[in-house]
A protein has these predicted regions:
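Repeated loop/turn-to-beta-strand initiation elements of outer-membrane beta-barrel proteins
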Residues: 49, 76-79, 89, 120-125, ...
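Transmembrane beta-strands of outer-membrane beta-barrel pores
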Residues: 42, 55-59, 85-89, 116-118, ...
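Flexible loop and strand-edge segments within Gram-negative outer membrane beta-barrel domains
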Residues: 88-109, 115-182, 188-206
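Short strand-turn segments of transmembrane beta-barrel domains in outer membranes
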Residues: 6-8, 24-27, 37, 41-71
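Surface-exposed extracellular loop regions of Gram-negative outer-membrane beta-barrel proteins
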Residues: 1, 76-95, 107, 133, 144-146, 182-190, 194, 279-284, ...
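Short acidic/polar hinge/loop motifs at secondary-structure boundaries
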Residues: 1-22, 110
Length: 320
């Protein structure tokens, strides 16, 4: 339900790196991607600095504060606490069209991360807890939410979102086979949004669970790798547009296999596929192909092809 807000729910100071995939995504990551994927890697507790403070202010009344606390709990456990707050307090209409250039906003975002790392037995794990509260108001410059909501005096909108996330990731690298690993990911979140756009009201509560088990190894040598595994998704939507009820449940279970060839020089190939069973879409297969070739040092040719299947969430994805 948060697709329309993209990375605005992930503060920039939390991000260690961003990976962008163009074209059909990896079969490992699900059956939906066809035009690309964005993955954000958050700063890890191990290796982070003990304290970080960042403050930002601009002439258009956008203010932001970021604070990171990092501590080593033991030889194998580390923890980080990320605090983020931002607000926009003043109205602006630089182009004089009668509407706000940017929404009035207020956000509180808290993340607590724990990392376990045991080099002796090859075990690493992450536990994440996050709470988000986000409020936005937009519309005409003269809109007053206390006076004009539910009327035709001035057009306005409010979007109030509360979100809770819990995720875990456990990885194991086989001690005598460093190229062989096993990973298990779980994520649970509750997204609760109350909003209105003019005279139209839109409320949605989404409860989601995602689980992914993946095994990585090689075939003969490290130029030939493969990944295989299982995953399960569950989404419960309690969605209302005015008095219309669009509540539903989506769940799926799937299996995937992906082969990678990489000569560590000028050519790599990823060939994969998955089979999934969805409670509303049925059983289907989604193949994926990626190829990369360097004909010379400063040139890269890429090719990707694949099939995807997706259950659209048309109201949440097309919010103003």
């Amino acid at each position: 339900a948060s697709q329309a807000y993209g990375l605005s729910f992930t503060p920039g100071t939390w991000v260690e790196s961003i990976q962008i995939t163009k074209g059909a995504g990896s079969a490992v990551n699900g059956y939906e991607s066809i035009s690309g994927q964005i993955n954000t890697e958050l700063i890890k507790p191990i290796g982070d600095i003990p304290f970080f403070l960042n403050a930002y202010g601009s002439t258009d009344s956008r203010f932001e504060l970021n604070t990171h606390f990092n501590t080593k709990l033991s030889d194998k456990w580390s923890s980080s606490l990320f605090l983020h707050g931002n607000t926009r307090v003043a109205k602006s209409d630089m182009n004089n069209d009668g509407f706000l250039d940017n929404p009035l906003a207020k956000q509180i975002n808290v993340l607590n991360r724990y990392q376990y790392y045991n080099e002796e037995n090859g075990l690493v794990s992450f536990i994440n807890f996050r709470y988000l509260n986000d409020e936005k108001q937009t519309g005409e410059l003269d809109f007053d939410k206390n006076r004009d909501r539910g009327t035709t005096n001035n057009w306005g909108s409010e979007i109030n979102t509360e979100r809770l996330d819990l995720s875990t990731k456990v990885g194991y690298v086989f001690k005598d086979l460093p190229y062989q690993s096993l990973g298990f990911q779980n994520a649970f979140n509750i997204h609760n949004q109350h909003s209105y756009f003019g005279l139209n009201q839109y409320n949605i509560k989404q409860s989601s669970y995602y689980s992914n088990l993946i095994f990585n190894s090689i075939i003969s040598n490290t130029m030939n790798k493969f990944a295989t595994g299982l995953n399960f998704t569950y989404d419960k939507y309690q969605e209302f547009v005015n008095v219309n009820d669009y509540s539903r449940i989506d769940n799926s279970v799937g299996a995937f296999f992906e082969y990678t060839y990489d000569n560590d020089d000028d050519f790599s190939l990823i060939l994969g596929g998955r089979i999934d069973n969805h409670n509303r879409l049925g059983t289907f297969v989604t193949p994926r192909l990626h190829a990369r070739y360097n004909p010379w040092e400063k040139a890269v040719l890429r090719f990707s092809a694949g099939r995807r299947k997706r259950s659209a969430n048309i109201n949440a994805e097309n919010q103003p």
